[in-house]
Regions:
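A sensor for short, sequence-defined functional sites
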Residues: 1-382
Length: 382
């Protein structure tokens, strides 16, 4: 027999699959979710309590002035919270980031929230280790071109909004739908077989075009420049059962390798993606810093050096950094092994909320990450 948590997650993850496939909220209104989901839990004999809260986009619950801003949630005995699934949902086990670390109120009544009694509390806040973006870059120099294969792996709230951006409805339904007897997009449509298959074919054609454009934009945003060519794009894990969402892209860039006499310069810092740059008046701040959630960025860069070239020691030394403070961490380590340059990088946002008095801690790390983004190495001709 499944536990209460397993039964609730089984029910909820079907709703998540539906929302991701159709790119919309499962219910048009939160109050409808607060009615429907409990009815299903009751049939499954899963105990629950009703909760209200607000998102980070609205006022705190204690300051609420418009009940339309209240969000209905359902809580299990173990404290797990469920909200109306939407395009940003990733799993029943991961609370939507907009509802984390927020003032909330639970009612002990399972029938009607207003019956009470009531209890104030704060919703769960995730940790930086829960929300990880991990990239692995393998690059090969070909004269003035750089051939890049990059794998992105996302966990926790880092998956929000990404799944329906890069995975087709067919991929989502096949990966998420197996426990429900769903084998493709046509199976979740309330159509007869022939009409469902036609609708699935039409959706597949639309997804192919849209997702191709999304990957083009992703690569352009990553390097702040369009690639010369895109060789392949592939989603290798769709994030079902709270597993990581993973995709791989292979493409060719110019402008990152340049000749300098007999030597070459490689803009290796560009291989970690664009970094935040704070300048001018933006460096002066009077309010606390509120991030979406704590998170960690991890990058592993492998560059195959062209035959007859090596990395100068001075260039290599500049790629090593170790900064750590109360609120953020930025560490890089570079080494050459054989004919390959290896770089390991980690940037951690330790907290969601940082007092303005510690704004300098944030600037210190962001400045160093931006500096690294602009680092070049000299490849000296032997």
């Amino acid at each position: 027999m499944k536990s209460d948590e397993e039964k609730a997650n089984f029910i909820y993850d079907y709703m998540v699959m539906w929302s991701l496939a159709f790119k919309k909220e499962y219910m048009n209104y939160d109050i409808q979710f607060g009615t429907l989901f409990p009815q299903v839990l009751k049939k499954a004999k899963v105990p629950f309590t009703r909760v209200i809260s607000t998102t980070w986009s609205d006022e705190a619950l204690s300051n609420i002035i418009n009940f339309d801003n209240a969000v209905s949630l359902i809580e299990l005995k173990n404290g797990q919270l469920f909200s109306n699934p939407n395009v940003y949902s990733v799993s029943g086990k991961v609370l939507y980031s907009q509802l984390q670390n927020r003032e909330a109120q639970r009612s002990k009544s399972s029938n009607n929230f207003s019956e009470g009694p009531f209890e104030d509390f704060k919703t769960l806040a995730s940790k930086s280790s829960d929300n990880v973006e991990k990239i692995e870059v393998n690059a090969t120099i070909d004269d003035a071109l750089l051939h890049i294969t990059r794998t992105e792996t996302l966990t926790g709230n880092e998956k929000e909004g990404v799944i329906p951006t890069y995975a087709t409805a067919e991929e989502i339904c096949k990966a998420w739908g197996e426990p429900y007897g769903v084998h493709g997009y046509a199976d979740i449509l309330s159509y007869k077989k022939s009409k469902g298959e036609a609708a699935a074919k039409e959706r597949a054609e639309a997804d192919k075009k849209e997702i191709s454009e999304n990957f083009q934009e992703e690569i352009k945003n990553y390097h702040d420049k369009a690639p010369v060519s895109i060789e392949s794009t592939e989603v290798t894990s769709v994030g079902q059962n709270n597993t990581p969402f993973t995709y791989k892209v292979a493409y060719t860039m110019d402008g990152l390798v340049k000749k300098a006499g007999k030597n070459l310069t490689l803009s290796v810092g560009q291989l970690i993606g664009q970094q935040t740059h704070i300048e001018g008046k933006e460096r002066q701040r009077t309010d606390d810093i509120i991030f979406s959630y704590p998170r960690t960025f991890v990058a592993t860069i492998n560059v195959e050096l062209p035959s007859g070239y090596n990395v100068t020691p001075e260039s290599l030394q500049k790629l090593n950094t170790n900064l750590d403070n109360e609120d953020m961490r930025f560490v890089t380590k570079a080494e050459v092994m054989g004919n390959k340059l290896f770089i390991h990088l980690e940037k951690e946002y330790k907290k969601q909320i940082v007092p303005v008095a510690r704004w300098q801690n944030i600037l210190e790390i962001l400045d160093r990450a931006y500096d690294f983004n602009n680092q070049q190495v000299i490849l000296r001709k032997k």
